[in-house]
Amino acid sequence: MEMNFAFLEKKQEYELFSGACIDAERILESSPVMSAVASRKALELCVKWIYSIDSALEPIGNREGLQSLLHNNGFPSLMDITLWRRLQHIVRNGNESVHTSKRLTRDNAVLSLNILFDFVEWVDYCYGRDYVERVFDEKKIPDATTDMNVVQEEYRQVIKDVQKNADKIVNEKDKEIERLLA
């Protein structure tokens, strides 16, 4: 089953933040804390992407933090106030996960993912091409076993590719040796 954020991989314009969104979803079952941190990172990258393409927003400096970006420069007025307020949950969960010893529950991490998904949906609706409405589905979050199976399959594919390339190189070298001996 395709993950919630998988559609981002098909949209090159979202390359800046798509990987972070996918990572946040992929790691949830293994580590809700790391998922919350990754959700916060994905949010920050997505917000910076908006600043880079929306001419209504003034360019940002390299030292602008996420809270400054969320609160300044007319950013809150771009979207529904309810969505904007919900973004604080992602920031709070991510910051607490990094800076405190507070245990983050799976439910809180899922909520962060859900809010991130809603925000990315809003971004796609406002700034994307070929928008298709999507709904967050918790059942699409890969479990640890599924994630391990994906990693194992990717590993097998890499081994196949290496072997194929090695065989190709050996064949090319054999032909070169034959040519030199002839």
Predicted region positions:
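Amphipathic alpha-helical interface elements
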Residues: 1-182
